[in-house]
Amino acid sequence: MLAAAAAIVVLVLALPPTGAKAQSAQDRELLLKAAFLYNFAKFVEWPTGAFAAENSALTICVHGDDVFPVIAQAMNGKTVGKRSLSVVSRPRPPASAGCHISFIGANEPESSYVGHLKSPNVLTVGDRARFARTGGMVGLVTVDN
């Protein structure tokens, strides 16, 4: 009886905690990119008029359904100065109205965003090698992963 109880305790201790998820390599990479976006938000100075009010949130628009959940969760509850961060998902083509940072995921077709990169007061960040060459401001590129 004691051996059976000990075996049950060992099995219970070996189980992962409820709600625990293994982090994939892609999720770890997205968390790193979210950290870059957060640091960009901390160090960019937006022009007068970029915010509706002094206490308006800083909005990061994420274009790409495959990357939105991880980035949104990583930014949850964060602030930049006195501003809260708001992370929203935007459909194709990227609508940049109300965005301060526009992040375009690697799976978004180039044709869906190229014409929308010249929005005033918006820092455009893309997850592909040619992003900066096609009019984006910051291109995040993985080299020798």
PLM features: residue spans?
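Short hydrophobic alpha-helices and adjacent helix-cap/hinge residues
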Residues: 1-145
